[in-house]
């Protein structure tokens, strides 16, 4: 749930099937709910432009003082109240009221409106958005001068946005209230490009550990030059680093573990076996104390997806905890912080991760943490290497004194 996506919210004019606004941001699926801005004329287009032919057959505009064709109409449109009715959940409307369909703007009866800018202040406790009138600096209305501000409610932040949701907007005026239909939809894409399923890049590197060369390097001697001409210098050829196989990489892990153990407790390395585990989990989290960074926008370190998998049960030690830690896991916490309110991102220091109850992440979204009642521990990720006394390993290779035989058949 803490994964960062590229989230784009699109407002579409249904009648003309044109995009009225698109707003993109980086965030999680829990906190990526920005304030959307759109102009009323982008929702309306030319649908509020009734054209009536005059007596000569020429097209002329009607006397209606609304629409977006001319500056004076857009200016007059600012004075009209408007109200918005949802069409995405007709069953949640007022009981006993028929709100109609798209041809009515889902506002066939009073009481169906859930938001808007009108003297009776339409409101709702269950709809997903609020739509209010914004402020415009274009007094001449030569450009866009009917801004609307769309915000998501708490119900909207909890809703499923798998598909577009529709609303109807109507002007409140004497006579017929014109209708504008629009949808709000969410598009989600990953930051990193998708990884191909194959081929497996590890398989070509499955090589045994390279053996140490037993022969020392020999320096060849040359006879002195008989002529006086100086020998030509040959430029040394530069070779790139040789790509080591999986065997060498695994051996390097064990050797690194040995060096760390020998530096801290040399008595344990006199006679021992260090073994990599052969089944998951291949890693272990060590809880640590550290200073995280608090960001209002996700930093680049939050955009990567950890390739490793780890659960809280594979974390040991004591470190920094964020969130509400249950009693069963308080032993992991040397220091506990409640975090922050609002849309903040807590980025772990370089080389560390947050081990949360919901998985491993380089970054914590406080919106997700507060919404899910999750908790996280700051950890370093280390490969699991088991330590064995020599006797334990020798027993696996020593032959038994007596072997089990088949019972005698009579």
UniProtKB/Swiss-Prot annotation:
Disulfide bonds join 85-107, 99-112. Residues 1-410 are extracellular. Specific enzymatic cleavages in vivo yield mature proteins. Envelope glycoproteins are synthesized as an inactive precursor that is N-glycosylated and processed likely by host cell furin or by a furin-like protease in the Golgi to yield the mature SU and TM proteins. The cleavage site between SU and TM requires the minimal sequence [KR]-X-[KR]-R. Residues 193-242 are annotated as: Disordered. Gene3D superfamilies: ENV polyprotein, receptor-binding domain (3.90.310.10). Glycans are attached at residues 6, 21, 227, 262, 267, 294, 334, 350, 370. The mature envelope protein (Env) consists of a trimer of SU-TM heterodimers attached by a labile interchain disulfide bond. This is Envelope glycoprotein. The lineage of its organism: Viruses, Riboviria, Pararnavirae, Artverviricota, Revtraviricetes.
